[in-house]
UniProtKB/Swiss-Prot annotation:
Protein name (database record): Cullin-associated NEDD8-dissociated protein 1
Function in brief: Key assembly factor of SCF (SKP1-CUL1-F-box protein) E3 ubiquitin ligase complexes that promotes the exchange of the substrate-recognition F-box subunit in SCF complexes, thereby playing a key role in the cellular repertoire of SCF complexes. Acts as a F-box protein exchange factor. Required for SCF(TIR1) function. Modulates SCF(TIR1) function through its interactions with the CUL1 subunit. Represses photomorphogenesis by promoting HY5 degradation in darkness.
UniProt keywords, alphabetically: Acetylation, Repeat, Transcription, Transcription regulation, Ubl conjugation pathway
Source organism: Arabidopsis thaliana (Mouse-ear cress)
Gene behind this protein: CAND1
Gene Ontology cellular component annotations, sorted alphabetically: plant-type cell wall; plasma membrane
Modified residues (N-acetylalanine): A2
Signal sequence, renumbered to the chain: none
Chain intervals for the UniProt region annotation (Disordered): 311-340
Family, similarity comment: Belongs to the CAND family.
InterPro entries xref list: ARM-like, ARM-type_fold, CAND1/CAND2, TATA-bd_TIP120
C-alpha cells in the first residue's frame, strides 16, 4: 500500500512541471511517507526515489531543495549499500564540478548522508567519499568555497568514522597540513578544525608528524604573520583534541610559543593571544608534562595580564574617601577607548591562562599567592569590561581552589594559602570598593561575586572592613539603575557576611543596612524578595544576638522588620519560595523580638498556624514553631497552642517522612517549654502516634520519637495516665527494638534514656522492667537465637536501668547476674552471654569491688569452649576494671603474665581498660604503666596477627595517655630486626591518631617520618601497616604529614602496582589456585590515596597518579576497581582539568567493566557482584560526564554513545545520575 502511495507521489513529480507549489507539496508528501516506520522499499523504487530526490536538490526554489535534503536522512536508512554509494558519488560530483548555486545544497546533502549512514556501511562509503574530498581540498584550480565545503564534510567524517579510515590518515593529514599555508583565512580556519577532529584517531607517529610539521612552520621566521597565527592556533587545537597524548611534544612547542609571545611586534596582539591560548590548553590538557614550564608560564601571564602599550595609568592610588566618588565615576565614563586597540585580547588570554594554571596546579598555590595575587588585585582596575570579568573569574578560581585544598586545615602556617590570602584582604577590599563605585552593573555583580567567594573561604575576614563595604551594598540595593542580578548578588553577599561575622561588628551600620534590605523585601521580582527575606533572618540575629543586653539599642528596628515581613507573610498571591522565606523569617522575628511584639502576636501567630494547613508551606511552618518554642523569651502561645498541638499530632500520621521528623522535633521543643499548658488527653493521643514511629526500619525517626517520650515522662505534667500510656503503647515497641542487631547510635542512647525515665519518672516497677529486658535475650521458636549485637544493646539498657534504680536494686541485680554465671558455666546460653555483658556495662559505670570474687567468677568463663562466651567474659573483665583500676588492673596484668593460654583474651580485657582510659584521660600509676608497656612490647613479635593487632591498639591508646614515654619507645622499635615488631609499632601509631587535638601531636610530629618511611620496608606487612597509618594521619591530622608528602607519595603510588613477586600459584591437586599476596597492600594504598585527595589536594599531583597508577587500578581486582571508581569520581569533582587531560586513556577500562558479562554457569553471587561493579563504574562515568569540556574527548563521547545504544545500561545510568 505504501509503495502505491509513493508511486503516486513520484508520478506527481513528472506532472508538476514549472509549478513550484506542486513540487513543494509532492516533496513534502514524499518526506512524510519516508518517515513512516511501516515504509518498505524494493530495488526498482530505490532507483526511482534516489534519482528523483537528487534531481530535486537542484530545484531553483530553495524551500523545495531544502525539503529534498531532509528526504535524504530517512532514505539513507532504507536503501541498500549500492544506492548510497551511487548517491554519494553523484553528490560529490555536484559539489566538485556542479554549478555554484547548487554547491551549498550538495554539501548539506553529503553531510546528511554522512550523519545517517549505519556504521556497518561506513567503510564502503568512505572508500568513495574520502579520495574525492581530498581531491577537492588539494586539487589545482579548486575555489576556496569548494575547499571549505570539502573541509567541513571531512571534519564530519573524521569525527564520526576517524578510526575506520586509518589507511587514509597519512594522505589526508599531508593534504590538510599543506592547507595551513593557504592564503584564504577561511580555508586555514576550517583546516585547523579538521586536523583537530582527525587528531584524536591518529596514531602516535602521525600525531608526532603533524606536530613536527607545525613547529617547523613556526620556526620559519619569514612566514607571513597570519600563517604563523594559524599554526599557533593549530598547536592549541591539537592539544585540546588529544589531551595527554600531546604531552611528549611540549618540549618542542612550549619554548617556541613563549618566544613568539615575548618577541612579537607591538601590533601583533593576536599572535600573543593565540600563544597564550595554546599555553592554557597545555596547562589544562597536559598537566603532568607541562610541569617543568609552569614557573615560566606564570611569569609570562603576569607580564601580559597588564599588557597595555597604548594606555598609561597615571591615576593615583585609590582612596576610600567618599567625596571622590563622583569624580571617579566621571573618570570611569571617560576612560581611554580605541576601536583599533586589540591589546585587551592579550590581557584576556593571559588572565585565562593564569586561571588554567591555578585550577590545574594546586601544589603551586603558595607561589601563586606570593607572585600573582597582588597583580590580580591590581588588575581589578582593568578598563575593558570583558577582560575585567575574566580577571574577577580568575581570582574567584584562586579563592575556590584555596578552599578546596585547605579544607579542614588551620591557617597558622605562614606558607599556607589561607594565611597568605588573609594578608591580602585589605588590598582586596580596597580595590573591590572602587569597583563597587563604577557605573557598570556587570562590574558590580562581578565585584560582589569576588567578595562572596572570599567570605566562603575566610568566613571572618571582613570584620575590619564592614564600614567601607556598607556604602557599596546600599548603592547596589537603592540605585534605580540596578538590575535584579546585581541586587541578588549584593543580598547573597550581605547574608553571607552577616552569618559569618560577630554581631557587634555590624551594630554601627544596622540603620544603613536595614533600610535598603527591608525595601528589597517589597520588590516585585520574587528572587530578590526571597533573598532579602533571608538577609532579614540574619539581620534579626545580628540586631539582638542574645536576650542579655549588649549595649546596642535594637528596639527601633523591631517594628520595621516585623511590618516588612508581615506584609509578605499575609500575601497569598506570591511565589512559594517567598512564602517559605517569609514564614522562616517570621519565626526568627517572634523568637528574637517576641517580648517587644506582645500586641502583635495574637494576629501573627494564627497566620503561621494557618500556613501549616497548606501542604506547600506546612513543613516550613512546623520548623518555624520549633524556633519560636526554643526562644529564651518564652513566647506566649496560648492563643494557638491547642490548635497547634492538634495539627502537629495529625502530621505524625502523614506519609511525608521529613514532615514527621520536623514535627517530632517541634513537639519536643513545645512540650519542653509549654508542657504544663498542654492537656494530658493530648499527650495520650501523641503517645499512641509515637508508638507507631518506633521501628528499626527508621532509626533516626525512632530516636526522635523516644526523645519525645522521655520529655513527656520527665515533664511537670507527667501523670499516671501518661505513664500508663507509655507502658501500654511505647514499652512493647521499645522491647522489640532492643532485640534488633541494627540498633545503634543515637537511637540506642535514647532507648537507654527511655528506660531510665521509666524508672525515675513513670513509676514503673524496676523488677518488672528488668525481667522484661532479660527476657528479650531468650531465644524464641519463631526467630531463633538473639543476635550478638542485640545482646550488647540489652546489656547497656540493663546497666542504665540498674543505676537509675539506686544502689540497692543495682547490688541485687549484680548478685543475680553472678549467680547466673555460676549456674550456667560451661553452656553457650544467651542468658550467660547477657549476664557477662551486663556485668561489664554496670562495672564500667559503677565500682563493683564490694562484690567479692566477681573477677574470679568472670574469668572462669574463659574456660568456656564457646568463643562468644570467652569474648563476652573478656569484655566484662576489662569494663569491671575500668570501675576500679587500682583493684582490678593488677589482677589482669598478673593473669596475663601467668596464664599463657588465656593471653589473647586477657589482652582484649586490657585493651578495654586502656581504650576507656584514653577517652576519659585518666592516669595510670607509674608502676602500672611500666608493667603494661613491658607486657605489650613482649607480645609485639607474636605469630598470631590477632594478638599483634590488640597489642598495637593498646600501645596506640597508651600513647594518648603517656605520650612522653610511648613515642620514643615506639620509635626505637621502628629499626627492630623483627618485621612483626616494626609492623606493630607503626600500627600503634595509627591507633594513637584521633580527631581531637592531643598533647601527643606535638611530641610525635618531629618523629613521624621514622614511622611512615616504613612504607619502603622490605616486608609487605610492614608496608601495609605504614600505608594504613599514613591514611589515618591524612584523614584526622593532615597538617602533621604535609611536609613529608613529596617524599612519601611516589613510594605510596608504587604500592598500588601489581608486583609479580607477590603472586604465587598453589597446587590443589585437581586444579591450581593463584594467590595474590599484594592485593591487600594495593587496596590499602588506593584507600590512602582517596583520603589524601580529599584532605591534602594541594600536595597531591593528580596528573602523576592518574596515569599510570589509577588507570592500572581500573583494570585490577574487583575490590580495587570499586575503590578506583570512587577516587576517579572525587578527582573529577576536585580537579577536573587533571582528569580531562588523560580522560581518553581511562575510557577503555571503564568500557570493559560496564560491558563485562559473567559466564553462563556463574553463580548468583558472581552476577550480583558484577552488577555492583557496573553500577560503581557508571557512578564514575556520571561524575566524568559533569566535567566542563568533556565533549573534547571523542573516546568518551563514543562510550556515552555505546551506553545509549544499550537500553538496560542507559536506564541504569539515568537512575544513578538522578540519585
Amino acid at each position: 500500500m505504501a509503495n502505491l502511495q509513493v508511486s503516486g507521489i513520484l508520478e506527481k513529480f513528472q506532472m508538476t512541471g514549472k509549478d513550484k507549489d506542486y513540487r513543494y507539496m509532492a516533496t513534502s508528501d514524499l518526506l512524510n511517507e519516508l518517515n513512516k516506520d511501516s515504509f518498505k522499499i524494493d530495488l526498482d523504487l530505490e532507483v526511482r526515489l534516489s534519482s528523483i530526490i537528487l534531481q530535486q536538490l537542484d530545484d531553483v526554489a530553495g524551500d523545495v531543495s531544502g525539503l529534498a535534503v531532509k528526504c535524504l536522512a530517512p532514505l539513507v536508512k532504507k536503501v541498500g549499500e549500492e544506492r548510497i554509494v551511487e548517491m554519494t558519488n553523484k553528490l560529490c560530483d555536484k559539489l566538485l564540478h556542479g554549478k555554484d548555486q547548487h554547491r551549498d545544497t550538495a554539501s548539506i546533502a553529503l553531510r546528511t548522508v554522512v550523519a545517517q549512514i549505519a556504521p556497518t556501511l561506513a567503510p564502503s562509503i568512505l572508500v568513495t567519499l574520502t579520495p574525492q574530498m581530498i581531491g577537492g581540498i588539494s586539487g589545482q584550480g579548486m575555489s576556496s568555497g569548494i575547499k571549505c565545503e570539502c573541509l567541513e564534510i571531512m571534519c564530519d567524517v573524521v569525527q564520526k568514522y576517524g578510526s575506520l579510515m586509518t589507511d587514509d590518515h597519512e594522505k589526508l593529514l599531508n593534504t590538510l597540513l599543506l592547507q595551513l599555508g593557504c592564503n584564504q583565512a577561511t580555508v586555514r580556519k576550517k583546516t585547523v578544525t579538521c586536523i583537530a577532529s582527525l587528531a584524536s584517531s591518529l596514531s602516535d607517529d602521525l600525531l608526532a608528524k603533524a606536530t613536527v610539521e607545525v613547529v617547523k612552520n613556526l620556526s620559519n621566521r619569514n612566514a607571513k604573520s597570519e600563517i604563523t597565527r594559524t599554526n599557533i592556533q593549530m598547536i592549541g587545537a591539537l592539544c585540546r583534541a588529544v589531551g595527554y597524548r600531546f604531552g611528549t611534544h611540549l618540549g618542542n612547542t612550549v619554548p617556541v610559543l613563549i618566544n613568539y609571545c615575548t618577541s612579537a611586534s607591538e601590533n601583533d596582539e593576536e599572535l600573543r593571544e593565540y600563544s597564550l591560548q595554546a599555553l592554557e590548553s597545555f596547562l589544562l590538557r597536559c598537566p603532568r608534562d607541562i610541569s617543568p614550564y609552569c614557573d615560566e608560564i606564570l611569569n609570562l601571564t603576569l607580564e601580559y595580564i597588564s599588557y597595555d602599550p597604548n594606555f598609561t595609568d597615571n591615576m593615583e592610588e585609590d582612596t576610600d574617601n567618599e567625596t571622590l566618588e563622583d569624580e571617579e565615576d566621571d573618570e570611569s565614563a571617560n576612560e581611554y577607548t580605541d576601536d583599533e586597540d586589540a591589546s585587551w585580547k592579550v590581557r584576556r588570554a593571559a588572565a585565562k591562562c593564569l586561571a588554567g594554571l591555578i585550577v590545574s596546579r594546586s601544589e603551586m598555590l603558595t607561589k601563586v599567592y606570593q607572585e600573582a595575587c597582588p597583580k590580580l588585585i591590581d588588575r581589578f582596575k582593568e578598563r575593558e569590561e570583558n577582560v575585567k570579568m575574566d580577571v574577577f573569574n580568575t581570582f574567584i578560581d584562586l579563592l575556590r581552589q584555596t578552599g578546596n585544598v585547605t579544607k579542614g586545615q588551620t591557617d597558622t602556617d605562614e606558607s599556607s594559602p589561607k594565611w597568605l590570602l588573609k594578608q591580602e584582604v585589605s588590598k582586596i577590599v580596597k580595590s573591590i570598593n572602587r569597583q563597587l563605585r563604577e557605573k557598570s552593573v556587570k562590574t558590580k555583580v562581578g565585584a560582589f561575586s569576588v567578595l562572596r567567594e572570599l567570605v566562603v573561604v575566610l568566613p571572618d575576614c571582613l570584620a575590619d572592613h564592614i564600614g567601607s563595604l556598607v556604602p557599596g551594598i546600599e548603592r547596589a540595593l537603592n540605585d534605580k539603575s540596578s538590575t535584579s542580578n546585581l541586587k541578588i548578588e549584593a543580598l547573597v553577599f550581605t547574608k553571607l557576611v552577616l552569618a559569618s561575622h560577630a554581631p557587634p561588628v555590624f551594630h554601627p551600620y544596622i540603620k544603613a543596612l536595614s533600610s535598603p534590605v527591608l525595601a528589597a523585601v517589597g520588590e516585585r521580582y520574587y528572587k530578590v524578595t526571597a533573598e532579602a527575606l533571608r538577609v532579614c533572618g540574619e539581620l534579626v540575629r545580628v540586631v539582638r544576638p542574645s536576650t542579655a543586653g549588649m549595649g546596642f539599642d535594637f528596639k527601633p528596628f523591631v517594628h520595621p522588620i516585623y511590618n516588612a515581613i508581615m506584609s509578605r507573610l499575609t500575601n497569598q498571591d506570591q511565589d512559594q519560595e517567598v512564602k517559605e522565606c517569609a514564614i522562616t523569617c517570621m519565626g526568627l522575628v517572634i523568637s528574637t523580638f517576641g517580648d517587644q511584639l506582645r500586641a502583635e502576636l495574637p494576629s501573627c501567630l494564627p497566620v503561621l498556624v494557618d500556613r501549616m494547613g497548606n501542604e506547600i508551606t506546612r513543613l516550613t511552618a512546623v520548623k518555624a514553631f520549633s524556633v519560636i518554642a526554643t526562644s529564651p523569651l518564652h513566647i506566649n502561645l496560648s492563643c494557638v497552642l491547642d490548635h497547634l498541638i492538634a495539627e502537629l499530632t495529625g502530621f505524625l500520621r502523614k506519609a511525608n517522612r521529613v514532615l514527621r521528623q520536623a514535627t517530632l522535633i517541634t513537639m519536643n521543643t513545645l512540650v519542653t517549654a509549654y508542657g504544663d499548658k498542654i492537656g494530658s488527653e493530648a499527650y495520650e493521643v501523641i503517645l499512641v502516634e509515637l508508638s507507631s514511629l518506633i521501628s528499626v526500619s527508621d532509626l533516626h525517626m525512632t530516636a526522635l520519637a523516644l526523645e519525645l517520650c522521655c520529655t513527656l515522662m520527665t515533664g511537670k505534667s507527667c501523670s499516671e495516665n501518661i505513664s500508663l500510656a507509655v507502658r501500654n503503647k511505647v514499652l512493647p515497641q521499645a522491647l522489640t527494638l532492643v532485640k534488633s542487631p541494627l540498633l545503634q547510635g543515637q537511637a540506642l542512647l535514647d532507648l537507654q534514656k527511655f528506660f531510665e525515665a521509666l524508672v525515675y519518672h513513670a513509676n514503673t516497677s524496676f523488677y518488672t522492667l528488668l525481667e522484661s529486658l532479660l527476657s528479650c535475650a531468650k531465644p524464641s521458636p519463631q526467630s531463633g537465637g538473639v543476635p550478638k549485637q542485640a545482646l550488647y544493646s540489652i546489656a547497656q539498657c540493663v546497666a542504665v536501668l540498674c543505676l537509675a534504680a539506686g544502689d540497692k536494686n543495682c547490688s541485687s541485680t549484680v548478685k543475680m547476674l553472678m549467680e547466673i554465671l555460676k549456674d550456667d558455666s560451661g553452656t553457650n546460653s544467651a542468658k550467660q552471654h547477657l549476664a557477662l555483658l551486663s556485668l561489664g556495662e554496670i562495672g564500667r559505670r559503677k565500682d563493683l569491688s564490694a562484690h567479692a570474687g566477681i573477677e574470679t567468677i568472670v574469668i572462669e568463663s574463659f574456660q568456656s569452649p564457646f568463643e562468644e562466651i570467652k569474648s563476652a567474659a573478656s569484655y566484662a573483665l576489662g569494663n569491671i576494671a575500668v570501675g576500679n583500676l587500682s583493684n582490678y588492673l593488677p589482677f589482669i596484668l598478673d593473669q596475663i603474665d601467668n596464664q599463657q593460654k588465656k593471653q589473647y583474651i586477657l589482652l582484649h580485657s586490657l585493651k578495654e581498660v586502656i581504650v576507656r582510659q584514653s577517652v576519659d584521660k585518666a592516669d595510670f600509676q607509674n608502676s602500672s604503666v611500666e608493667k603494661i608497656l613491658a607486657l605489650l612490647f613482649n607480645h609485639c613479635e607474636s605469630e598470631e596477627e590477632g594478638v599483634r593487632n590488640v597489642v598495637a591498639e593498646c600501645l596506640g591508646k597508651m600513647a594518648l595517655i603517656e605520650p612522653e614515654k610511648l613515642v620514643p619507645a615506639l620509635q626505637v622499635r621502628t629499626t627492630s630486626p623483627a618485621a612483626f615488631t616494626r609492623a606493630t609499632v607503626v600500627t600503634a601509631v595509627k591507633y594513637s591518631v584521633v580527631e581531637r587535638p592531643e598533647k601527643l601531636d606535638e611530641i610525635i610530629f618531629p618523629q613521624i617520618s621514622s614511622f611512615l618511611m616504613l612504607i619502603k620496608d622490605g616486608d609487605r606487612h610492614v608496608r601495609r601497616a605504614a600505608v594504613s597509618a599514613l591514611s589515618t594521619f591524612a584523614h584526622y591530622k593532615p597538617n602533621l604529614i604535609k611536609g613529608l608528602l613529596p617524599e612519601l607519595l611516589p613510594l605510596l603510588y608504587d604500592q598500588t602496582v601489581i608486583k609479580k613477586e607477590l603472586i604465587r600459584t598453589v597446587d590443589l591437586g585437581p586444579f591450581k589456585h593463584v594467590v595474590d599476596d599484594g592485593l591487600e597492600l594495593r587496596k590499602a594504598a588506593f584507600e590512602c590515596v582517596f583520603t589524601l585527595v580529599d584532605s591534602c589536594l594541594d600536595q597531591v599531583n593528580p596528573s602523576s597518579f592518574i596515569v599510570p597508577f589509577l588507570k592500572s587500578g581500573l583494570e585490577d581486582h574487583y575490590d580495587l576497581k570499586m575503590l578506583c571508581h570512587l577516587i576517579l569520581s572525587l578527582l573529577a569533582d576536585k580537579c577536573p582539568s587533571a582528569v580531562l587531560a588523560v580522560l581518553d586513556s581511562l575510557v577503555e577500562p571503564l568500557h570493559k567493566t560496564i560491558s563485562f558479562k559473567p559466564k553462563q554457569d556463574a553463580v548468583k553471587q558472581e552476577h550480583d557482584r558484577n552488577e555492583d561493579m557496573i553500577r560503581s563504574a557508571l557512578r564514575a562515568i556520571s561524575s566524568l560526564d559533569r566535567i566542563n569540556g568533556v565533549d573534547y574527548s571523542h573516546k568518551f563521547k563514543g562510550l556515552m554513545g555505546d551506553m545509549k545504544r544499550s537500553v538496560p545500561l542507559w536506564e541504569k545510568f539515568q537512575t544513578i545520575r538522578n540519585e
